[in-house]
Amino acid sequence: GFPQDPNFKIASGGKGIADDGSVFLKLDEYQWRIGVHQDDNNHGILYIGFEVDNVSKLEEAKQHLINHKVDVLDGSDEDARSRGVGGLIKFSDPSGNPVEIYYEPTLDYKFSSPVAGQTFVASNLGLGHLMILTASREQTFDFYTKILGFKLTDYISFDGGDGAWFMRCNPRHHSMALSKFGEANGMHHIMFQVDSIDSVGRALDRINAAGIKISSTLGKHINDLTTSVYIKGPNGWDVEIGAETVNIHDDDKWIPKQFVEGDIWGHHGIMDSVAEVSADLAAKDNDGKN
């Protein structure tokens, strides 16, 4: 649901739709994971949130960022209320993506999907992952690993090109991936993990029945072993629905690997999708400059 009383954080109940038309989507016991807002400027990503344990950790993160010459803003009480958290700070990564660190998210009832039997793999693993296209990949990678403390998981080279770099901040194989494709800056896809391959298949049945465009066929990634399908989202970027993603529980024993291809099988069309999303991002960027 969405907050009705400005003196309280987001409350349970309701349809999760705000007066301005914003929609808040739930995956697990967190009050919400995805905020969808009307944006006439086609910004795409309006915020990416990462959680810390408490207010002391938030203050430590703030000071750490300041020490590294990052411009940090304190989130207002209204910001915290609208996000459903105890408090937050705001800054941008070198690619221009707006990032927030927060503590004390509102938790409520367990998730119950309108699709019977559907569950997501989230909770302490976060909502899933983001694949970001960036012309400043090296600087952005250094920012997330050397300043924010993410760990490198793997590299993949696509068709001999720049490929993607995968990073984690919890046991999930990766929460963030960075790919360089020309001068494009923005999101290529967001991934949601479901509880089984059968759930992926049933989702694919619903996708086909709804006539939604499939960007990349069913396939299995070589690095995180996810079996998934990619579909075209309404804002131009892709949505990946997958299952059986690798988790990493011992950082000391994990050795990053470099792969020269992205998949064990399937995922036909994925490079065409990257090119299509990149072109769309470039067009939106040009529109914003005109």
Question: Where do the language-model regions lie?
Answer:
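Vicinal oxygen chelate
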Residues: 39-64, 66-135, 165-166, 183-290, ...
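Core segments of cupin and vicinal oxygen chelate
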Residues: 1-32, 132-174
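Short, structured motif recognition centered on aromatic/hydrophobic residues
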Residues: 2, 25, 36, 44-49, ...
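A compositional/structural signature marking long, glycine- and acidic/polar-rich segments
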Residues: 156-225
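Conserved active-site tyrosine of GNAT-family acetyltransferases
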Residues: 1-3, 9, 65, 96, ...
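An N-terminus-focused feature that recognizes amino-terminal "leader" regions
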Residues: 1-63, 67, 71-88
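Short beta-strand/turn micro-motifs at beta-sheet edges
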Residues: 34-38, 116-119, 176-180
